[in-house]
Amino acid sequence: MPLVDSPAIDLDIKEWMLGPSTNISNELGKPILIKVFQVNCPGCFTHGIPEVLEIRAKFIDSPLLIWGLATAFEDFHLNNLDNLKKLIDSGEVVGETLAVLSAKGLLNNNRLDYSIPFPVALDNVVPYNPSDYLSEAQNFIKKDFPQFDSFPVKNQKLISDQVMTYLKQKKFEAKTFETYQLKGTPSTLLIDNKGILRGKWFGSDYGLEKEVEKLLSL
């Protein structure tokens, strides 16, 4: 797992859907903002991507590169290549994204009223077949429950059992999502012009504009 202020690891990409094929190590000298999203993720389209569109408009004359990374850690029947193609080609959305954005009046004929204007890649989603479920569970708990050791024994057992059940039902994993140990979508990665990971966040509304300004000042 790359830590903040350490070298960023290249994205493990299945396919570039929009824009030229590239990667972090190919773009040294340029700062990069990567918005990680899922097709079936309403918050990605009510907050995550609109936030990046605002950043793009504000910093259009800067050297900042902006990429989208479509990943999948759930709902694999919706978060897939076919639905990403629909999104890229026509703005068509599906699943909970369709339901929520329709209810908010944000769609036109089940489509976004804008096109995504930056390169988008598909995370490499592969079958999940760990050799050691116990080790996987311990790593999962360490990532998502940093105060685990301070919990009562009863709570520790409950969490451990739930995590193990989840992992044994898990069929696929998204390589970049797992490598960066992201907690959900939308998430954001900021990488400086020397290829150093300078920020990693889950969610929106955490002052991304100021973080980008700091990145560009390095």
Model feature map: region roles:
Residues 1, 106-108, 174-178:
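Short, P/G- and charge-enriched loop/turn segments at secondary-structure junctions
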Residues 42, 75, 127-129, 197, ...:
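Flexible, glycine-rich phosphate/dinucleotide-binding loops
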Residues 46-137, 144-151:
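Structural microenvironment flanking redox-active thiols in thiol-disulfide oxidoreductases
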